[in-house]
């Protein structure tokens, strides 16, 4: 049985991956699950065809960042400095962290999530799902080897892709 996190080939019936320790408990369920399990384990993030991200500098005002999100109909901005990812600012950051602040007085760097967990375009959907579940994230940036933002994947994107693969 392949581990959904590291793809190590474990013995059937194992409860935990011998390589990375990830739980294999609900991954050995017969019938029904196989329809999308192969998609999750084998398809790479780049197969989802996600578009380019909207990036802003860390010194942009919070009100301007929220305006950018509204105009682009998105709920996640990638924060880049010199072309490299330094943070993420989401609608949740705006609602929870900045809701009672005078927005014009603050920069997005004051409320962004710095040094976010990232994905690579060749990571599998299983890795994306694992990182989202463990970290409690709804969005994860996709970066290249130089930490340059390529895209952002959301839990909704992954869900739609899996449902679409069911035919």
Regions found by a protein language model. Name each.
Residues 1-167:
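Tandem CBS (Cystathionine beta-synthase) repeat/Bateman regulatory domains
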